[in-house]
Regions:
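Rossmann-like NAD(P)-binding element
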Residues: 47-49, 54-86, 90-96
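Active-site-lining helix/loop region of Rossmann-like oxidoreductase modules
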Residues: 128, 141-197
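General beta-strand structural signal in soluble alpha/beta enzymes
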Residues: 52, 116-122, 167-169
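Rossmann-fold NAD(P)-dependent oxidoreductase module
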Residues: 16, 20, 111, 158
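NAD(P)+-binding Rossmann beta1-loop-alpha1 motif at the extreme N-terminus of oxidoreductases
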Residues: 1-45
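Rossmann-fold NAD(P)-binding glycine/threonine-rich loop
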Residues: 91-134
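Short, conserved loop/helix-junction motifs that constitute active-site signature segments
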Residues: 79-84, 111-112, 135-136
């Protein structure tokens, strides 16, 4: 399992995912379209374990988070080589464009052919994702889906280590339909409370 998490996109979602990975004890390389030099303040705020990188360097990590607006995804990942990396699809297609009956995660999987896509972190707001997942004595719930069991296991461990309670929704199509922006789990913020004795 990779200890390095690459993040493509340094906005609110990218920074929230960086905080989550750091909380889980991972190292983070974060990138944006303007280059590493523009990320000094972001990296300083994230603290130890975080560094700035180019998008291609972030894409070479064992786990890669796509955290850019959906309409910018093709440009953000164009030309990268995908060879077994785990790609976390944290995007949402807010414009609900014509996906021809497919989920946005299926389309992303086509763009990163050779990678193993796991859909997660898109049903919570960036602010909630970045906050302490232990609430009211329980654990914040995060959903994921994907077609590769080992990839889902590695991503589950990342979120478990960060303090979340992970629920696996199954394959990318089934889970993706529930997680996408007009699906039943979009915007749902649940906390798993401990069972009483």
């Amino acid at each position: 399992m990779s200890r390095l998490v690459g993040i493509i996109g340094a906005g609110r979602l990218g920074q929230a995912m960086a905080r989550t990975a750091l909380r889980a004890g991972r190292h983070v390389v974060i990138s944006n379209s303007r280059g590493p030099g523009s990320l000094a303040s972001v990296v300083s705020e994230l603290g130890a374990g975080a560094s700035a990188a180019t998008a291609s360097q972030a894409a070479a990590a064992g786990i890669v988070v796509i955290a850019v607006p959906w309409d910018r995804v093709p440009e953000a990942i164009e030309g990268f080589e995908w060879d077994g990396q785990i790609v976390i699809d944290a995007t949402n297609d807010f414009d609900a464009g014509d996906l021809r009956g497919r989920t946005s995660s299926e389309l992303l999987a086509d763009l990163v052919a050779g990678a193993r896509v796991v859909k997660t972190a898109n049903t919570l707001t960036a602010a909630v994702l970045a906050s302490d997942p232990h609430e009211a004595g329980g654990q914040r719930v995060i959903f994921l889906s994907g077609d590769d069991d080992q990839a889902k296991s590695d991503v589950s461990k990342l979120f478990n280590d960060a303090g979340f309670f992970v629920i696996d929704l199954g394959d990318l199509i089934t889970g993706g339909q529930m997680q996408q922006i007009h699906g039943p789990l979009a915007g749902v913020n649940l906390v798993r409370l401990p069972m009483g004795n």
